[in-house]
């Protein structure tokens, strides 16, 4: 039985992690943490997330280095802002814990990215070099040996899963930059209240065009340039991405369908559509990334959908956890 800490357990993704680990056959939650200024300190998890009453009644504890030092901790999940994870990762690695970081603090190797997109200078370059990018379907062998797994961003996950097979097999015309329009529910902005994600204020609008933090992440890990246009939608959870590309040759629908099926046939959390398109309704509260597409002449439009809190965050983190410790990839997820 593996002992697990979860930091940032009051947030949306953190709560999903608590749920997954609680029902995991081979792991046990030792403690759950929130920030030192949180109003939830001392409250039960089930007070904040009432659906877990009499199921998960653990108390929230404040983050500080004294309480974080626990004996016999095997793994730590950080569902925290990047500046918190940035500081905590070295600490937990020094305690020989395997760390699963859901923030953007260690996802990208190019240190210039952190100054430009995150506003800080990355000083833990030795750790950054050792971090493994946790795109579970593509980096399984690296994840098996990693001590720090940087769980990909929500947008970055579904976009890469949709594009990587085409890039790997050199199906795309290099002269045409993929154009990505993706819509996320407001839970992607976190749990803290602000005017941006207020129900009465959100309609459907683009944001952070050319400046979104997932842009350099997508570009670095795909290895090609893209134009990424994120949108905020007036729904709670889920991401739908529409990706327009140009193919190198006159590939048929069956050619592309066979490619996706070949690449993902052993990947239980990827569902490839032969008919119709994915929808947010089909993936909300489920751990899947659904992929569909249509071709006209040499153009292909790929539609990818996922739950941003699950396959885009907690479910993928648990998937990486399972891979790292040799469990079934879908243990506690399905």
From Swiss-Prot:
* Compartments where located: Cytoplasm
Against Pfam families, the record matches this protein to: Semialdhyde_dh, Semialdhyde_dhC_1
Alphabetized UniProt keyword annotations = Amino-acid biosynthesis, Arginine biosynthesis, Cytoplasm, NADP, Oxidoreductase
Q: Which InterPro entries match?
A: AGPR_AS, AGPR_type-1, NAD(P)-bd_dom_sf, NAGSA_dehydrogenase, Semialdehyde_DH_NAD-bd
Q: Which SMART domains does the record cross-reference, listed alphabetically?
A: Semialdhyde_dh
Q: Name one GO molecular function term.
A: N-acetyl-gamma-glutamyl-phosphate reductase activity
Task: Tell me which EC number(s) this protein carries.
Answer: 1.2.1.38
Q: Name one GO biological process term.
A: L-arginine biosynthetic process
Instruction: Kindly state which reaction or reactions the protein catalyses.
Output: N-acetyl-L-glutamate 5-semialdehyde + phosphate + NADP(+) = N-acetyl-L-glutamyl 5-phosphate + NADPH + H(+)
The active site lies at 154
GO-annotated cellular components: cytoplasm
Instruction: Tell me its family.
Output: Belongs to the NAGSA dehydrogenase family. Type 1 subfamily.
Q: Give the protein's biological function.
A: Catalyzes the NADPH-dependent reduction of N-acetyl-5-glutamyl phosphate to yield N-acetyl-L-glutamate 5-semialdehyde.
Q: Which HAMAP family match?
A: ArgC_type1 (MF_00150)
- Annotated protein name in UniProt: N-acetyl-gamma-glutamyl-phosphate reductase
Q: Which gene encodes it?
A: argC
């Amino acid at each position: 039985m593996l002992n697990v800490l979860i930091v940032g357990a009051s947030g949306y993704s953190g709560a999903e992690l608590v749920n997954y680990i609680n029902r995991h056959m081979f792991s046990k939650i030792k403690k759950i943490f929130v920030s030192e200024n949180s109003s939830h300190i001392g409250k039960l998890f089930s007070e904040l997330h009432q659906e877990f009453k009499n199921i998960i009644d653990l108390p929230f504890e404040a983050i500080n280095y004294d309480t974080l030092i626990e004996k016999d901790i095997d793994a730590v999940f950080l569902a925290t802002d990047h500046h918190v994870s940035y500081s905590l990762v070295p600490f937990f690695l020094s305690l020989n814990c395997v760390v699963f970081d859901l923030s953007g603090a260690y996802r990208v190797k190019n240190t210039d990215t952190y100054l430009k997109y995150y506003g800080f200078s990355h000083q833990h370059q030795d750790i950054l070099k050792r971090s493994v990018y946790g795109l579970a379907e593509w980096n399984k062998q690296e994840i098996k040996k990693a001590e720090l797994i940087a769980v990909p961003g929500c947008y970055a996950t579904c976009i890469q899963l949709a594009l990587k097979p085409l890039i790997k097999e050199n199906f795309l015309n290099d002269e045409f930059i993929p154009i990505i329009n993706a819509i996320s529910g407001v839970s992607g902005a976190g749990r803290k209240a602000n005017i941006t994600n207020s129900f009465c204020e959100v309609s459907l609008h683009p944001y952070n065009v050319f400046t979104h933090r997932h842009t350099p992440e997508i570009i670095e890990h795909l290895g090609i340039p893209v134009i990424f246009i994120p949108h905020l939608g007036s729904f709670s959870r889920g991401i739908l991405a529409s990706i327009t590309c140009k193919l190198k040759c006159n590939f048929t629908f069956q050619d592309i369908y066979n490619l996706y099926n070949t690449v993902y046939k052993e990947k239980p959390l990827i569902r490839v559509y032969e008919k119709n398109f994915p929808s947010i309704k089909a993936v909300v509260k489920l751990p899947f990334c659904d992929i569909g597409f249509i071709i006209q002449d040499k153009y292909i439009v790929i539609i990818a959908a996922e739950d941003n809190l699950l396959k885009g965050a907690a479910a993928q983190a648990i998937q990486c956890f399972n891979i790292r410790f040799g469990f079934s990839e879908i243990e506690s997820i399905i």
